[in-house]
């Protein structure tokens, strides 16, 4: 069941989408998505990226975050992106199409980046929503746990993690799990995130 109020197939959703100032700005600047502005706002506060870093981008399609990161880490940096959806090629970005919960896909991902060699793990993964809060939040936390597990395998000491999750039951426990791996944990809600959305972004720094 899809909540018709916010369904991407509804005329109401489409009207709001195309009137959105960030959608308009993304179109004007020829960006792939409005999520570029979310990452920019977070990075202005938390300074996640620097030249030469290796970054994993989970839930990368259509490529808004990958393009942003590329502009920050330069030609000496490296981005490995992964999504179940296709993504148009971005020069300098290695894209892996598949579900990162699939052991075969995660094995390829780990092979590409090496053990404890990644500076930042990003996850903008989101579940298909039902409009039923308890289900949507649970699915979001599940994706957050997948991303956190990838951090445990690939993130170097003092590395950083940025993950999108939905607010609701289970978030407090998830925050505790993130705290167990990182010294600094913050919650961000950038202006480009729609006010009615349950999404928040957890910024975790200084992997233990």
Curated annotation (Swiss-Prot):
Keywords: Cytoplasm, Methyltransferase, rRNA processing, S-adenosyl-L-methionine, Transferase. Pfam families: FtsJ. Its EC number is 2.1.1.166. Gene3D superfamilies: Vaccinia Virus protein VP39. The keyword Cytoplasm applies. It catalyses: uridine(2552) in 23S rRNA + S-adenosyl-L-methionine = 2'-O-methyluridine(2552) in 23S rRNA + S-adenosyl-L-homocysteine + H(+). It is found in: Cytoplasm. GO terms for cellular component: cytoplasm. Specifically methylates the uridine in position 2552 of 23S rRNA at the 2'-O position of the ribose in the fully assembled 50S ribosomal subunit. Belongs to the class I-like SAM-binding methyltransferase superfamily. RNA methyltransferase RlmE family. This is Ribosomal RNA large subunit methyltransferase E.
């Amino acid at each position: 069941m899809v909540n018709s109020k916010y369904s991407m197939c509804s005329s109401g959703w489409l009207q709001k989408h195309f009137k959105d100032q960030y959608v308009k700005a993304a179109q004007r600047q020829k960006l792939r998505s409005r999520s570029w502005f979310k990452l920019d706002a977070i990075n202005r506060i938390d300074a996640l990226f620097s030249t030469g870093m290796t970054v994993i981008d989970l839930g990368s399609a259509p490529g808004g975050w990958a393009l942003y990161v590329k502009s920050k880490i330069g030609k000496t940096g490296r981005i490995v992106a992964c999504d179940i959806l296709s993504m148009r090629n971005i020069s300098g970005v290695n894209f892996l199409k598949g579900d990162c919960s699939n052991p075969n896909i995660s094995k390829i991902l780990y092979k590409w980046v090496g053990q404890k060699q990644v500076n930042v793990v990003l996850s903008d993964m989101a579940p298909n929503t039902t409009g039923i809060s308890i289900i949507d939040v649970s699915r979001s936390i599940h994706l957050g746990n997948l991303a956190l597990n990838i951090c445990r395998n690939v993130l170097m000491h003092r590395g950083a993690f940025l993950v999108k999750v939905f607010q609701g039951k289970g978030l407090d426990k998830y925050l505790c799990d993130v705290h167990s791996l990182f010294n600094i944990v913050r919650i961000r809600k950038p202006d480009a995130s729609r006010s009615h959305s349950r999404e928040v972004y957890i910024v975790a720094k200084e992997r233990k």
